[in-house]
């Protein structure tokens, strides 16, 4: 009798312990399976969409060049492309040059025309000038840039003397390079794009702190279309971009085809580059 009672108690206890262990394993296995999803949902910046800005150089009534900067978290890069005021917008009636389109439209309408012409989405536009160069660089600090050749200019009003080799770029030097009088439009676009690419490659992390002095200097020294909501989205893209490793900032060459009367058209190669670097697709 005692043996039967002992066996019954032992069997009952075994079933209880086994059931408890099974429930424990099931519950914690389910938790483990859900962990990645929960981790993903708690880090929305990983999935931040790319943000493309249109930077418009404007001073003394003249505009251009025009620069596209894309903050692309999915591919970990910041491509920069600059096109001249003479570039033709083939998607518009009479195919006007960018300078004419800009003159006849509002800033936001020009951004929309750029979207249509190049097949991209522009998140916001910024108007920058000499004051922007000096104000932003005063907060960002100078950065090194390799100048391939010496540049000299003097006309009684302006004096520019930059030696070939490594230059420490200040606000004045930034402005002098972008507006160097003896550059043709293609050379000006190339230098502008490389300067802006170098700037973001070296200084993008300084935009990360909430209300950073660098961000404030950009917004205060420019006319722009970026409201509080857009600023939050832009900051989210930059935060995601810098989350794991230093993003690659690169100059994207803007090749132009010359028409019979000297018009400059975006080449097929350039349009392919824009499609590759300024759209939201992830490159495997």
PLM features per residue range, with description:
Residues 2-81, 269, 278:
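Entry/capping segment at the start of metal-dependent catalytic domains
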Residues 54-62, 75, 79, 84-96, ...:
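C-terminal solvent-exposed extensions
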Residues 65, 107-115, 119, 130-134, ...:
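Extracytoplasmic/secreted envelope proteins and their assembly/folding machinery
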Residues 79-105, 149-164:
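Flexible, solvent-exposed short loops/turns enriched in glycine
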Residues 104-161:
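Amphipathic, coiled-coil-like alpha-helical scaffolding segments used for oligomerization/assembly
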Residues 138-214:
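Flexible, polar/acidic helix-loop-strand segments at domain edges
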